[in-house]
């Protein structure tokens, strides 16, 4: 039977350790408040027992009552004059023996309470130490500023990256021998992945867990030290409750909610930046149509609305690298996008635009600006003798099929033209004119 249980013992310990890791104790704030308030209550009860119950008894135990006892002398007991007092001395001896056993019990209880209070005091100081000594180390490579040396959390290190020796020593001491090979592999990977820069900094960010914060605020060393070196009575519970309430209100209802609000605002700013700047660079605007053929007898229902579709495709190689590609309609192949900041839907064509030809209409007394151009091979070709040439990265898109939504539904040719999209947020409209013959 025991031979069956022995192979299952490592699996049992592994299951228990995995279960403890999956519980998420670091983020359990409710558990920290329960444990901290319970320990504070226990410390208050121990100090109250010391000052009210054990203080008077401990004063009596300071003197030693084990003096020389004449009733134990055999010479005096053989004397007939002393025998009359023998019974009285015998009863007194039994009473002192009972008192001594009672005193021993009181001393044990007093010492237990005394060491328990000091243990709770050290435990509170340890939680406070864990609160203020929990950091995450980050390496700053690309931030260049003249005031970085004055930052209290930044530390300048050597240009060449070296693995921390303390981390290696602790890893080698705590891990098994089989982890040594994996540690060397990770060291090689980190050295190859890190960029080669001239100098960099290390940032020690204070990052305690929520469990430690809740435990330290509910079992703080301030209230423990005050209870340790003051006279505790029944009315002392009132300032304890006020202290716990102020700490809870200040740390969680205000300070912790501020971090949540900052994270929410940061997310809102990120989404706003992504909507206004990133998506217009990565996506193309199309015009979709939605029709309802069920009511075709009544004229039907047609609705045009703009949509954005991305032409970037992301996939992973076998090595784990992320590759971003786009489809080239000319070559009918996928191309790697090396610079995604560049608008992928803009074509690097040279657009040559003539200055407008001004013609005065005598009937309306207005000037008609017309642009004479020839659209050929997605370029505007003009005479080379014209003085003004504007070079832009644009795409000529028919305005009616993509951007011009005529709500009246008319097919008037006067509304036709070409929209030149020079940026994701700016569009220029040039009226279409008859092509000029060469």
From Swiss-Prot:
Its main location: nucleus. It is found in: Nucleus membrane. The chain crosses the membrane at residues 109-129, 219-241. The keyword Transmembrane helix applies. One of its GO terms (cellular component) is nuclear membrane. Pfam families: DUF2418. One of its GO terms (biological process) is regulation of exit from mitosis. The keyword Transmembrane applies. It is a multi-pass membrane protein. Residues 405-438 are annotated as: Disordered. Keywords: Membrane, Nucleus, Transmembrane, Transmembrane helix. Residues 405-414 have a biased composition (Polar residues). Member of a perinuclear network that controls recombination at multiple loci to maintain genome stability. Required for rDNA repeat stability. Belongs to the NUR1 family. This is Nuclear rim protein 1. It comes from Candida glabrata (strain ATCC 2001 / BCRC 20586 / JCM 3761 / NBRC 0622 / NRRL Y-65 / CBS 138).
